Amino acid sequence: MHHATPLITTIVGGLVLAFILGMLANKLRISPLVGYLLAGVLAGPFTPGFVADTKLAPELAELGVILLMFGVGLHFSLKDLMAVKAIAIPGAIAQIAVATLLGMALSAVLGWSLMTGIVFGLCLSTASTVVLLRALEERQLIDSQRGQIAIGWLIVEDLVMVLTLVLLPAVAGMMEQGDVGFATLAVDMGITIGKVIAFIAIMMLVGRRLVPWIMARSAATGSRELFTLSVLALALGVAFGAVELFDVSFALGAFFAGMVLNESELSHRAAHDTLPLRDAFAVLFFVSVGMLFDPLILIQQPLAVLATLAIILFGKSLAAFFLVRLFGHSQRTALTIAASLAQIGEFAFILAGLGMALNLLPQAGQNLVLAGAILSIMLNPVLFALLEKYLAKTETLEEQTLEEAIEEEKQIPVDICNHALLVGYGRVGSLLGEKLLASDIPLVVIETSRTRVDELRERGVRAVLGNAANEEIMQLAHLECAKWLILTIPNGYEAGEIVASARAKNPDIEIIARAHYDDEVAYITERGANQVVMGEREIARTMLELLETPPAGEVVTG
């Protein structure tokens, strides 16, 4: 189908189909990701009806990857990255090796050459950035120990894939034609590693000062549009520069841009302002993956598809599980990492495309990679759901490591009661929290920012890291015997869900919440809040009171 405006058609068609099928998936109690992928299949060239631009869609999806990784970087400090390097580096490399060997074994069964097997195996070895991060975000695990290990593991995988993409042409020439010597290969590898190190060094030394400075200057203008624009310009600009100047992936470039901004107080505002765009383009990523999938392969090569899927779901996951256990982490952590990595994504598509261009991977190989990606991404939410049920039935506190036990079970003294439970410690929450502390009211803070939680704990303030929508987090904060629940988070509808859950757990608790609009006030009140404060209304009321109060020292005549 010819489109006069392919960009607009692709965005509108992709988002509309994703919305419809995402809603249907949600209605059927399955992950919306499945709906987004099916939307891509319907919009792709292999099914009748509407066909989106298959060249534009992946580029739009890459924007989602950039913004998503930038957001992750905003919550991921260099200290966090260094804390997991001992397991992330050897673990990721070993897991890539296992997956590659399994892929080579399958390719040998299919009658492909050694080099084809290596490329095919590498395609099956690296997880999707978007899928992994979405899974962690949905379960509020980004800031947990498990989340930090998974993200560190992902970063190492991305670095290995960057090296692979640069070295593959030289290796292919050496193995297939014999005209590339080891010295040339070593030089290429040295240059690539040098570029990666140079990029990281520049971001740590120069970007660490320059990026926060630019953000501070844009914030000082008082223009929200300029601030949001500066966030997007930095995220996209650094990611693009990383690719063009250093041959580093878009995802890694954006990640380090976010990480150097992490130390700035503006990082949370930046994360909040880019959230809608991140979500929209992340959806387009899943749609673009679905567009590449030809459903006929499920009929033409069912056994090969099942074998490919088995390598992704079980081969690499079991390798990751045993490696994490080998490093002394709990079963919970090992299973979470294994489930997170039980899928493939962006780099698999890029590597498969390069393999096709170099005549190293047949069309059948690329089709198997795409089938494995689609099916593994669809099944990933199911794996996590099964994992959570299994852990709920079998895991005990004794099975966790001491470190995890402290983080997840002993954040709050067991004897605290009749306290104020404050959800959110941003601009509003911090002002309120300081007043409560000054009044000697027992206080527990629930906050999603690890940095803020660490700062509060250093001051001796009880703080729980996590999302208040999670019942386990509320249990840690002792909701059942709290006297007040105060919600200062800006999302009124999320606050309403928290209110309903809290009211069911503690019918007598006094609940005060924040809202921005009249419909949010009504919604939160219906869910069980005692009082809802709308910021704009309170500002107007206070200003009116000031107008009615005569200034000090001035005589009012009437």
UniProtKB/Swiss-Prot annotation:
- Give GO MF terms, alphabetically: antiporter activity; monoatomic cation transmembrane transporter activity; nucleotide binding
User: Which residues form each disulfide bond in the chain?
Assistant: none
Q: Where in or outside the cell?
A: Cell inner membrane
* SUPFAM superfamilies in the cross-refs: NAD(P)-binding Rossmann-fold domains
Would I find Membrane among this entry's keywords?
A: yes
Is the keyword Membrane assigned to this protein?
yes
Give residues annotated as binding AMP.
427-428, 447-448, 467-468, 494, 514
Provide the alphabetized UniProt keywords. Antiport, Cell inner membrane, Cell membrane, Ion transport, Membrane, Nucleotide-binding, Transmembrane, Transmembrane helix, Transport
Describe its membrane topology: Multi-pass membrane protein
The highest taxon in the source lineage is Bacteria
Gene Ontology BP, a term? proton transmembrane transport
- The name under which this protein is listed is Putative cation/proton antiporter YbaL
User: What species is this protein from?
Assistant: Escherichia coli (strain K12)
Name of the gene this protein is made from:
ybaL
